Amino acid sequence: VLEVPADHFDRVIDVNVKGLANILRCFLPAMVKTKKGVIVNFSSGWGRSTSPEVSGYCASKHAVEGLTASLAQELPDGMAAVALNPGIINTEMLQDCFGKEPASHYPSAEEWAKRAVPFLLQVSPRDNGHPLAVPGIPTD
């Protein structure tokens, strides 16, 4: 955090926390009115742990976890809010952190989607408030 410019830290918080809150404000009224729907908020392994050099990102994803857990308690029966740790995916961010060769051992975004979509389509109100991860995708 000492080396991170304030505007970079602010941008991470603005996107990952404030952006999420703004999207929720748009969709929740209609969902609550019908008492139906599942909200899946993308978190991260770093939303459930910490690591040096990524304190702003960790802080933002811990906020996603907390916001989602609180929202789950506020929703009416028939709805759910879950925080999803998508697992380790071969993305540009991962390549920057791990290097291209080590990152290549993890699924691409396309491979992830093929595994995640069937899982996510089964998320229901019984999962409300539970932190989730995609089965078969490494999370650490």
Model-based region annotation:
Residues 24, 60:
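Active-site helix of classical SDR
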Residues 1, 5-10:
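Substrate-binding pocket helix/loop in short-chain dehydrogenase/reductase
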Residues 44:
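Residue(s) in the substrate-gating loop at a strand-loop-helix junction
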